[in-house]
Regions:
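Active-site rim/adjacent substrate-binding subdomains
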Residues: 1-140, 145-188
């Protein structure tokens, strides 16, 4: 089932997400719905807060990039209760980022190129790995959502001031995108 994506201004996007208990109801269906929503919206990553659930769940599908980045062929994974446990700050990189919850806004964000991540897979098996490159960037972006952060929190105050009108338009529902969204209720 395709779910609406919550846009900038929704309170759930600013909440710190809770760990998912092992007996979470219909977790496999939720993961399937998130992947379907991600495909429909033509994104590469989706965090549960973006669909209105304050739980630590992220899905990432980098297979769509396989023509340019063959190392991501068939890379389609859920990350349950993920946490970044270490940042290797010895090398950072600035790259433009966008977000399904911030349609039509793209800004350069500087992030470490290598991180250590712990998570559970779809079978609830634990993993602890160092991740680098583009996947590290995507994970940092998506895992930020689980901590109530968005990429615009990582740009300079000047850049944030320059996109102020775009953010205001999002809050007012004045934007276009090719996927279902959940807006803030209109104030009377």
């Amino acid at each position: 089932m395709i779910l609406p994506i919550y846009t900038y201004g929704q309170p759930v996007l600013r909440k710190v997400a809770e760990d998912i208990p092992t007996d979470y109801p219909d977790l496999q269906q939720l993961i399937a719905d998130m992947f379907e929503t991600l495909t429909e919206s033509e994104g590469i990553g989706l965090a549960a807060p973006q669909i209105g659930k304050a739980i630590r769940l992220v899905v990432i599908d980098l297979d769509v990039l396989a023509d340019d980045m063959p190392e991501y062929k068939d890379f389609k994974r859920p990350f349950i209760n993920p946490h970044i446990v270490e940042y290797d700050d010895s090398e950072t990189e600035s790259q433009e980022e966008g977000c399904l919850s911030l349609p039509a806004i793209h800004e350069k964000v500087t992030r470490p190129t290598r991180i250590r991540v712990q998570w559970l897979d779809v079978d609830l098996q634990p993993h602890d790995e160092w991740v680098e490159g583009f996947l590290a960037r995507v994970m940092q972006h998506e895992f930020d959502h689980l901590d109530g952060k968005m990429f615009i929190d990582r740009i300079s105050p000047l850049r944030k001031q320059l996109i102020k009108n775009k953010l205001k338009a999002l809050l007012q529902g004045r934007f276009r995108c090719g996927y279902k969204t959940k807006l803030l209720p209109k104030k009377n």
